[in-house]
Amino acid sequence: MLIAGVRSWWSFVLAANAGGRVSGDLLDAVWHNCGLLADGSIARFDHELSWAADIEPEVLLIRSAFQWHVRYSSAKLPHLMASRGIGTIRAIARRIGVDITQSHIRQFIEIETLLQSGIGYSSPERVRSAVRAALYVPHLPALKRLGDSLRTNFGRASRLMRRLAGKS
């Protein structure tokens, strides 16, 4: 079931692909921020974050799978708790026929580091370490803390965006 939804989402991403890259406006179009409509199209319902530069579609796939892994690896699901984030990401990518390279992973780490340190109160070094830990260390309580931190930072960003838009 998850993979079928991911395949539909990936088709949506590839349709936006221009010259091997997608708009940085799609940065927050991770699969749990999108919905599959009855006609088979994808609707984005949460897109408060964006990136100034275009990104490779594979980096967006890594970001989606990373956020999914962080969200559910602390849900006491044995197969996720025993895996490293990078293992989950690579397994999902393989299932939909996408090759993830070290270059894609490095780009993801850099984008996620700058994004999270920009909307949060942690230094880039701390965020980079937390992202790497979530990618390469099997389930630790640190993953839950990272997930909580990401949700808190996104909440702060949402409140800030609403306040700037005058919608307090």
Q: What annotation goes with each model-predicted range?
A:
Residues 21-77:
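Catalytic activation segment of kinase domains across protein kinase-like and atypical kinase folds
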Residues 1-28, 32:
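Conserved kinase catalytic-core helix
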Residues 4, 80, 84-87, 141, ...:
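Alpha-helix boundary/N-cap detector
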Residues 120-168:
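Membrane-proximal basic amphipathic "stem/tether" segments
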